[in-house]
């Protein structure tokens, strides 16, 4: 008898991706984050769908509609806090997933890596537009400041900003279009994630040793399907601890004040997951330069495959590059801290040093460390 999962056109696709997929026998918990990101995306799409049933994208009623969701809708407070903290969880998983890719040299799968970078940009755009929707003070001023950065683009800048705003300031038209984009983008992200997976399955997964694992493969199910279930359970436990006990820990208190164009908050800052990029933006005392640095802070990831000089793929047996990696991680924590501080000494100079270090490690120190390690292996 033929097994249905191996013959049915739809089941065959699922089978090749999640059941009979040959996987390396030694991939660690760091390889769980792909499935955890899928879980985060599902949580965000479902909670977002239910929120959109009660939300109104209008400047006069947006803030009240969010209050109505929290007060009057059955379990509305839960759905709202799941969605808000789900975004933070999404970025925690994203950054760990990218960190894993850098540490173990997964960026050598260029197509998978580049689609991952596109996915990161899409998720960042979605999160930014979602932050505008509750129409609190930080929503309004965050939208004003970040969209205004586009005016730094020579010649077309000011026209572009007015085109995005749909007027001469962030107003009803802006809120409306941001809601439309915020709704559609997660589905585009889901489609791109499938392409990401398609390219990954062309090459197969990398592993902690960074060596070919063709000689030692195991089926994805039951080994990694159960491992993913365990990872998902741990993620949900952590997620609901935050949602139910500390729902506002990661948010900004200013967003509980309705948007007021006549009153600027003392410190305009984005959500915590954008602070590192915001710090890099602010550390350059020139508008266009800052915008370029902001974009490059993410786009620099695309240079990882080009700047790989080592004869080994992963950092497992490369102590100098490992040191560089952990300095980079520490540097990102410093940038995140600086992004949340006011623009005054000593924070300005700390941010500038951390920004220079960020680009130096990736573009200069990593390649040099790789070459030194190659030499050391020959001694």
UniProtKB/Swiss-Prot annotation:
Heme b b562 binds at residues 83, 182. Its cofactor is heme b. It is found in: Mitochondrion inner membrane. A ubiquinone binds at residue 201. Disulfide bonds: none annotated. GO terms for biological process: mitochondrial electron transport, ubiquinol to cytochrome c. Pfam families: Cytochrom_B_C, Cytochrome_B. GO terms for cellular component: mitochondrial inner membrane; respiratory chain complex III. The keyword Metal-binding applies. The chain crosses the membrane at residues 33-53, 77-98, 113-133, 178-198, 226-246, 288-308, 320-340, 347-367. Keywords: Electron transport, Heme, Iron, Membrane, Metal-binding, Mitochondrion, Mitochondrion inner membrane, Respiratory chain, Transmembrane, Transmembrane helix, Transport, Ubiquinone. InterPro entries: Cyt_b/b6_C, Cyt_b/b6_C_sf, Cyt_b/b6_N, Cytb/b6-like_sf, Cytochrome_b, Cytochrome_b_C_euk/bac, Cytochrome_b_N_euk/bac, Di-haem_cyt_TM. One of its GO terms (molecular function) is metal ion binding. Binds 2 heme b groups non-covalently. Heme b b566 binds at residues 97, 196. It is a multi-pass membrane protein. Heme 1 (or BL or b562) is low-potential and absorbs at about 562 nm, and heme 2 (or BH or b566) is high-potential and absorbs at about 566 nm. Belongs to the cytochrome b family. PANTHER family: CYTOCHROME B. Component of the ubiquinol-cytochrome c reductase complex (complex III or cytochrome b-c1 complex) that is part of the mitochondrial respiratory chain. The b-c1 complex mediates electron transfer from ubiquinol to cytochrome c. Contributes to the generation of a proton gradient across the mitochondrial membrane that is then used for ATP synthesis. The cytochrome bc1 complex contains 11 subunits: 3 respiratory subunits (MT-CYB, CYC1 and UQCRFS1), 2 core proteins (UQCRC1 and UQCRC2) and 6 low-molecular weight proteins (UQCRH/QCR6, UQCRB/QCR7, UQCRQ/QCR8, UQCR10/QCR9, UQCR11/QCR10 and a cleavage product of UQCRFS1). This cytochrome bc1 complex then forms a dimer. This is Cytochrome b. It comes from Perognathus inornatus. The gene is MT-CYB.
């Amino acid at each position: 008898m033929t097994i249905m999962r191996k013959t049915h056109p739809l089941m065959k696709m699922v089978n090749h991706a999640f059941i009979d997929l040959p996987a390396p026998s030694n991939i660690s918990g760091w390889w769980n984050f792909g499935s955890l990101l899928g879980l985060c995306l599902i949580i965000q799409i479902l909670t977002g769908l239910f929120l959109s049933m009660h939300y109104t994208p209008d400047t006069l009623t947006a803030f009240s509609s969010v209050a109505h969701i929290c007060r009057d809708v059955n379990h509305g407070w839960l759905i709202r806090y799941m969605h808000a903290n789900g975004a933070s969880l999404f970025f925690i998983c994203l950054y760990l997933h990218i960190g894993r890719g850098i540490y173990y040299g997964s960026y050598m799968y260029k197509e998978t890596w580049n689609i991952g970078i596109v996915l990161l940009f899409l998720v960042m755009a979605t999160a930014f537009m979602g932050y505008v929707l509750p129409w609190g003070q930080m929503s309004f001023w965050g939208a004003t400041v970040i969209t205004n950065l586009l005016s730094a683009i020579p010649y077309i800048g000011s026209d572009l900003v007015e085109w995005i705003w749909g007027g001469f300031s962030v107003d009803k038209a802006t809120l409306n279009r941001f809601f439309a984009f915020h709704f559609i983008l997660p589905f585009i992200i889901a489609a791109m994630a499938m392409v990401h997976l398609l390219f990954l399955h062309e090459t197969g997964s990398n592993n902690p040793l960074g060596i070919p694992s063709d000689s030692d493969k195991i089926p994805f199910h039951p080994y990694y399907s159960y491992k993913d279930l365990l990872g998902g359970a741990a993620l949900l436990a952590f997620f609901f601890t935050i949602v139910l006990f500390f729902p506002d820990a990661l948010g900004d208190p200013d967003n509980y004040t309705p948007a007021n164009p006549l009153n600027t908050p003392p410190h305009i800052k984005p959500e915590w997951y954008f602070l590192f990029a915001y710090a890099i933006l602010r550390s350059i005392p020139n508008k266009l330069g800052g915008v370029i640095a902001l974009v490059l802070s993410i786009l620099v990831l695309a240079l990882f495959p080009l700047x790989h000089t080592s004869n080994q793929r992963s950092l497992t047996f490369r102590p100098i590059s490992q040191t560089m990696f952990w300095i980079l991680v520490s540097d990102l924590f410093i940038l995140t801290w600086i992004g949340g501080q006011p623009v005054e000494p000593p924070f300005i100079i700390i941010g500038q040093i951390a920004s220079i270090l960020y680009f130096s490690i990736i573009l200069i120190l990593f390649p040099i460390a790789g070459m030194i390690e190659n030499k050391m292996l020959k001694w």
